[in-house]
Amino acid sequence: MDDYKYQDNYGGYAPSDGYYRGNESNPEEDAQSDVTEGHDEEDEIYEGEYQGIPHPDDVKAKQAKMAPSRMDSLRGQTDLMAERLEDEEQLAHQYETIMDECGHGRFQWILFFVLGLALMADGVEVFVVSFALPSAEKDMCLSSSKKGMLGMIVYLGMMAGAFILGGLADKLGRKRVLSMSLAVNASFASLSSFVQGYGAFLFCRLISGIGIGGALPIVFAYFSEFLSREKRGEHLSWLGIFWMTGGLYASAMAWSIIPHYGWGFSMGTNYHFHSWRVFVIVCALPCTVSMVALKFMPESPRFLLEMGKHDEAWMILKQVHDTNMRAKGTPEKVFTVSNIKTPKQMDEFIEIQSSTGTWYQRWLVRFKTIFKQVWDNALYCVMGPYRMNTLILAVVWFAMAFSYYGLTVWFPDMIRYFQDEEYKSKMKVFFGEHVYGATINFTMENQIHQHGKLVNDKFTRMYFKHVLFEDTFFDECYFEDVTSTDTYFKNCTIESTIFYNTDLYEHKFINCRFINSTFLEQKEGCHMDLEQDNDFLIYLVSFLGSLSVLPGNIISALLMDRIGRLKMIGGSMLISAVCCFFLFFGNSESAMIGWQCLFCGTSIAAWNALDVITVELYPTNQRATAFGILNGLCKFGAILGNTIFASFVGITKVVPILLAAASLVGGGLIALRLPETREQVLM
């Protein structure tokens, strides 16, 4: 009995060396009952049969059958991992050879434009709310805090989408999850143009942001797996042009659609579909077109091989090869690959079958299984062998996002500040004026009236814009059909005066004294001061800022594979930091626009190199997950940068400039600690 140390689950014994031997008998089987002695085994009826207890012979047979699988499970995770890593390394080099045979041609260019539209939709999403807000705030009566939440909710959604959908793409497939991502964005972006309430609009933009948040990580992971090493850096950089195109598209559409107030309709008094809603729908078109076109593209063969789907991957690679060869005029060339290495599969997906559970139980098990796989994959990126690369990349991504998005919001805010200061410098001040029996039916704008006296005056069908009445006496005056913006009465005495059909609400009268005055049928609707005109200069600024990255995109694409990813990141971030100091000389609108274009043009190379090196540093089964984590952190940096930089507008330029420069210098230097991936095959 020394060789048998423990009892198994079936009442038998297992050897002490940890392996089952099917030809060894259980020692207890030698002991026979006196009751059954002398009976034929064929005639014997096992008494436990009626109680559902398995016969010892059945147990023995089952143990013998299960022995090989138990032996496999006892080999340990370490051996399986080592074997899988060896398989993945062999596959990486073989796949590189296969992509060289497939060539770079028509297939990659078709996929380039399809995925480019998805990336364009990501660029549009960043701008659409900020462009629509000046008009939407009137329809929804938005306060400053609500407008701020709308601006932030898009980034929150994109941050969540990057985390979730990036992880799913490594488990369910690039094409499948990207299609889901685009469908969610297109649906809720379009729906947001029809909803009337602030809460519903906020919710739609949040879900829309979650949908498009997964586009960037998946697009770069997806496209990289159809590129050979020699083409990867350059063509991933070319793909970045579509993000710039998204900004141009949004700016151009806002400029051409939103000012046309007649481009809409009304249904009754409560439902209004104005031109800004048309703009929101138009901005969903790139996403919709990309979603439809993606239906005709195949799944990534590299992902399929990672999942052990050899035949399906082979068919797609043959399709890539044949498409490119036909386009080059050599259709007779045969795809010579017959067998491709597939990594050993470590975990099998298990779910309850229809005969053993209800539909919601099966979906619950499926959800839990996928969630655990995605979570474990994410933990592996930040705690496994890639943790140092992930940490360095996280710092660089955050530094870039904090400075870039912070300054791109700060630039328009500073331009508005310069406009406001110039506007205030032209303000007219009237002191001690006396007006009797006048009829005023024109626009009064940018004026201050102090210590005046207005008697028996009539204000009718007029517009007050940025007007202040201070310490003024109104006697027997009549206000009819008056509209106002940023107009206030301060320390005034108002006697025997009638206000009929005006929007001069109670909060516009500050410390005023009323004597026998009456308010009749005040205007309904929003009681807040809202600008009547859209600032077209802001559209122009965004358009020029997006256009300015084109030279940087071209240069980075041409040099990416020549000078390497690290020099591109470090050089671009350090040059951008130097450009920040020129902002001290930005004391006018035109100067600020010029420095913005310079900053955007120099920083885009770092963004492109970051996209490329992030794709190349991680293996196929972690590529989209890691990209999603880093891109989600990027959106968090954008939120933080927007909030901090905007708080210093009109106070000081020193803090935003120093913060941006320090962030860029620090990120650029830390990036140099990353490994160069220019000559690396895609694992």
UniProtKB/Swiss-Prot annotation:
Residues recorded with modification Phosphoserine: S33
Transmembrane segments: 109-129, 149-169, 183-203, 206-226, 238-258, 278-298, 391-411, 536-556, 566-586, 593-613, 627-649, 654-672
Post-translational modification: N-glycosylated. The N-terminal cytoplasmic domain is phosphorylated by CK1.
Gene3D superfamilies: E3 ubiquitin-protein ligase SopA, MFS general substrate transporter like domains
GO MF term (any one): transmembrane transporter activity
Residues annotated as glycosylated: N441, N491, N516
All ranges on the Extracellular side of the membrane: 130-148, 204-205, 259-277, 412-535, 587-592, 650-653
NCBIfam families named among the record's database cross-references: synapt_SV2
PANTHER family linked to this entry: SYNAPTIC VESICLE GLYCOPROTEIN 2, SYNAPTIC VESICLE GLYCOPROTEIN 2B
Family according to the record: Belongs to the major facilitator superfamily.
Entry protein name: Synaptic vesicle glycoprotein 2B
Organism: Homo sapiens (Human)
Lineage summary: Eukaryota, Metazoa, Chordata, Craniata, Vertebrata
